[in-house]
From Swiss-Prot:
<keyword id="KW-0813">Transport</keyword>
<protein>
    <recommendedName>
        <fullName>Gamma-aminobutyric acid receptor subunit gamma-2</fullName>
    </recommendedName>
</protein>
<keyword id="KW-0968">Cytoplasmic vesicle</keyword>
<dbReference type="GO" id="GO:0005254">
    <property type="term" value="F:chloride channel activity"/>
</dbReference>
<dbReference type="InterPro" id="IPR036719">
    <property type="entry name" value="Neuro-gated_channel_TM_sf"/>
</dbReference>
<feature type="transmembrane region" description="Helical">
    <location>
        <begin position="275"/>
        <end position="295"/>
    </location>
</feature>
<feature type="topological domain" description="Extracellular">
    <location>
        <begin position="473"/>
        <end position="474"/>
    </location>
</feature>
<dbReference type="GO" id="GO:0060077">
    <property type="term" value="C:inhibitory synapse"/>
</dbReference>
<dbReference type="GO" id="GO:0030659">
    <property type="term" value="C:cytoplasmic vesicle membrane"/>
</dbReference>
<dbReference type="GO" id="GO:0030534">
    <property type="term" value="P:adult behavior"/>
</dbReference>
<keyword id="KW-0407">Ion channel</keyword>
<dbReference type="GO" id="GO:1904862">
    <property type="term" value="P:inhibitory synapse assembly"/>
</dbReference>
<dbReference type="GO" id="GO:0022851">
    <property type="term" value="F:GABA-gated chloride ion channel activity"/>
</dbReference>
<keyword id="KW-1015">Disulfide bond</keyword>
<dbReference type="InterPro" id="IPR036734">
    <property type="entry name" value="Neur_chan_lig-bd_sf"/>
</dbReference>
<dbReference type="GO" id="GO:0071420">
    <property type="term" value="P:cellular response to histamine"/>
</dbReference>
<keyword id="KW-0597">Phosphoprotein</keyword>
Amino acid sequence: MSSPNTWSIGSSVYSPVFSQKMTLWILLLLSLYPGFTSQKSDDDYEDYASNKTWVLTPKVPEGDVTVILNNLLEGYDNKLRPDIGVKPTLIHTDMYVNSIGPVNAINMEYTIDIFFAQTWYDRRLKFNSTIKVLRLNSNMVGKIWIPDTFFRNSKKADAHWITTPNRMLRIWNDGRVLYTLRLTIDAECQLQLHNFPMDEHSCPLEFSSYGYPREEIVYQWKRSSVEVGDTRSWRLYQFSFVGLRNTTEVVKTTSGDYVVMSVYFDLSRRMGYFTIQTYIPCTLIVVLSWVSFWINKDAVPARTSLGITTVLTMTTLSTIARKSLPKVSYVTAMDLFVSVCFIFVFSALVEYGTLHYFVSNRKPSKDKDKKKKNPLLRMFSFKAPTIDIRPRSATIQMNNATHLQERDEEYGYECLDGKDCASFFCCFEDCRTGAWRHGRIHIRIAKMDSYARIFFPTAFCLFNLVYWVSYLYL
């Protein structure tokens, strides 16, 4: 008879303890053998992965973060900088330029929108926790020490407050602090307008500590110190963004030596607007003033009105061109061009005034007047045989009407009494006989229009050649 604690199977006898051991070994082998593991669908695998990630991420109770912050702020004095009395606090800075523009040339300033970041170490903010970094909002900013950074050349600066203050604070467990904020700054830029509108400028953005000298705070640029956004959305209008560069310098003042960080934005002016608004109209007005050289000199109202109109138009254009500039005391490139155009237009008017003056004030020959007054001179005057090469008056019969063909007027002018015109012009009596002195300029007043048709266009073309080569390539 068998014992109650044993089972008889065939010729083998098994105890309950041995049976339990065998069961455990079989379950262990089945769990290790991959063929008996169940196949999981993709959805099950994703859930498993997410669950695994959730398990590996330590769950941080809200109370733990509150305890950490309370412990950090307990006994913390935000009026004192880190490592005070030990070493200077090192501030690493970088910025992201969101946009630049517009540039106001009259006020000599430009607008820039940036994200400004500062990083430093504060040993008082170290903590031991599974949390590596505390991501905090702007409410924590006023409770810890923040660098007193200010922008030296800013005229006006605004921090963004909609919908909440655009400030961010990060505290790592090793005491590293990151503080970023978004700013819109109207910064001063001293524009040198000598080459306007072909000028290029480097507009700075300078910042430093307001109260801590170099012995207390030292600023340094990060490796990727300044980055820019999409320049196509920038409102530069008249300018093109060329590039940027950043520098570090020490400025000495009566209160100490301060580390000053600067970013220079290189801008180049676009000429399209000023070419359409100033250069082309001024050139056309100058060319229009030359039309008077082809109008008959006896058409006094036509030539006078044309000259006065072009002069007044140039005056208006010069006034409009100056409105887009500050009231600088030096001459710009545009001022030079407009002034020369005004001189050409005014000279065309003066040319006709000179021509009309000499034509309307011509006098008969003095010798002829004497002969008319004294009949004895007419009787006894002896004339040497000469050949008169002047064109004589001719009578032309046309349609039963008699017309006198006018003699060339250039032989009818005399030098004006009381005028030393012989020093500059050839008096007409002398010109006819060829008795004018050596070195005297031989100018025929009647042909001033013919001379002006060649001189004015040639001089203006030479001026444009020198002007554009000098300002664009030299």
